[in-house]
Amino acid sequence: MSLEDDVKSIIVEQLGVDPSEVTENSSFIEDLNADSLDLTELIMTLEEKFNFEISEQDAEKLRTVGDVLAYIKTRQGQ
């Protein structure tokens, strides 16, 4: 499974959205109707899955699916 598929699967499961709604440009709040609790749970799940901590400062910048993918790729490249 690719990184994109992994992240999409987590988002679908955490937010209860249809997989077809999850694209790189999807905004968690505007497009996927996530609230702050949803986003906190999503960040925690991503941290657990990818085995690194996402700072509160970084988490606030993760507004779209593409933002999350780019962030994970950067962190994995370290």
Curated annotation (Swiss-Prot):
Keyword Cytoplasm: yes
PTM text: 4'-phosphopantetheine is transferred from CoA to a specific serine of apo-ACP by AcpS. This modification is essential for activity because fatty acids are bound in thioester linkage to the sulfhydryl of the prosthetic group.
GO biological process: lipid A biosynthetic process
Keyword tRNA processing among UniProt keywords: no
Keywords: Cytoplasm, Fatty acid biosynthesis, Fatty acid metabolism, Lipid biosynthesis, Lipid metabolism, Phosphopantetheine, Phosphoprotein
Source domain of life: Bacteria
Modified residues (O-(pantetheine 4'-phosphoryl)serine): 36
Pathway(s) served: Lipid metabolism; fatty acid biosynthesis
Ranges of residues in domain Carrier: 1-76
Record's GO cellular component terms: cytosol; membrane
Principal location listed in the UniProt entry: cytoplasm
InterPro entries registered for this protein in UniProt: ACP, ACP-like_sf, PP-bd_ACP, Ppantetheine_attach_site
Record GO terms (molecular function): acyl binding; acyl carrier activity
Localization per Swiss-Prot or TrEMBL: Cytoplasm
Family affiliation: Belongs to the acyl carrier protein (ACP) family.
Biological role: Carrier of the growing fatty acid chain in fatty acid biosynthesis.
Annotated protein name in UniProt: Acyl carrier protein
Annotated organism of origin: Chlamydia abortus (strain DSM 27085 / S26/3) (Chlamydophila abortus)
